[in-house]
A protein has these predicted regions:
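A residue-level signal for conserved active-site and pocket-lining positions in enzyme catalytic cores
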Residues: 1, 104, 133, 148, ...
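A non-catalytic, helix-rich entry segment at domain boundaries
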Residues: 1-85
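Active-site catalytic microenvironments for nucleophilic, acid-base chemistry
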Residues: 2-6, 135-140
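Short amphipathic alpha-helical segments and their helix-coil junctions
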Residues: 38-39, 111-115, 175-182
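Residue-level detector of short, conserved catalytic/binding motifs and their immediate flanks
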Residues: 46, 102, 196
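Alpha-helical scaffold elements adjacent to nucleotide-binding pockets in ATP/GTP-utilizing enzyme cores
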Residues: 58, 129-133, 174-177
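Non-catalytic protein-protein interaction segments used by genome-maintenance enzymes to assemble
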Residues: 79, 84-135
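Metal-dependent nuclease catalytic regions and adjoining charged, substrate-binding loops involved
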Residues: 94, 122-125, 137-209
Length: 209
């Protein structure tokens, strides 16, 4: 959807965005089955046929949502003279280098800054990622975001915006703990629904035995 926000007109020929191409390429690279649930329409779950069928509609829904937001008085934040779309942020938080890309940063009609992350999954993630983006945005660009939300592509809208209230110290401890585990070569499996499409399933101790 990035090229949509930078002024390219949506056409059937352009309905394949780079993001969905990456999803399809990733499916081919995975050593295991596609994720999601099997259905009458898509018996092979979320395989290439699923993404080919769903991506154009999701993109059209996104354009409608974005235009409705603009009509309601929302706007893109300006970062270094450009619309805040796919904003790269890299900073060191308590000796841990953290890199990311903030999908969208918007300004509400009353002037509050909101970070928005685009998700193609069906479940709303926890808010930790949005809080990390808040602190990275403040450190790198000296901009304070008060709220965050996820744009859920399957629903064509965002989750309810939430105040970003997790402290930098809490986030720093999270990354410091992860760094310590990596340096000690301690990798604890986090078994769950995402295991079916995990890119490191084969070497994982849960599935390799």
């Amino acid at each position: 959807s990035e090229w949509l926000d930078r002024g390219t007109t949506l056409t059937p020929e352009l309905a394949w965005s780079d993001a969905f191409r990456m999803e399809l390429d990733r499916l081919d690279e995975l050593p295991n089955k596609a994720g999601g649930r099997a259905s009458k329409e898509f018996p092979n779950k979320e395989d290439a046929d699923f993404w080919n069928a769903k991506a154009p509609q999701w993109l059209a829904d996104y354009v409608n949502w974005r235009n409705e937001m603009f009509d309601a008085g929302w706007s893109w934040l300006q970062v270094r003279g450009e619309d805040a779309i796919e904003v790269p942020v890299t900073a060191t938080l308590f000796d841990v280098e953290v890199k990311g890309f903030i999908d969208r940063i918007m300004v509400s009609p009353d002037g509050e800054v909101h970070v928005v992350d685009i998700k193609t999954g069906s479940r709303e993630p926890a808010s930790l990622q949005l809080n990390v983006y808040q602190h990275l945005l403040e450190v790198v660009h000296d901009v304070h975001a008060s709220h965050g939300a996820y744009y859920m592509a399957r629903k064509g809208t965002t989750t309810e915006p939430k105040p970003l209230s997790i402290s930098m110290e809490t986030i720093a401890r999270y990354f410091a703990s992860a760094k310590k585990g990596i340096e000690s070569e301690i990798y604890l499996p986090n078994v769950g629904m995402l295991c079916g499409t995990c890119g490191v399933r084969q070497p994982c101790s849960v599935f390799s035995e």
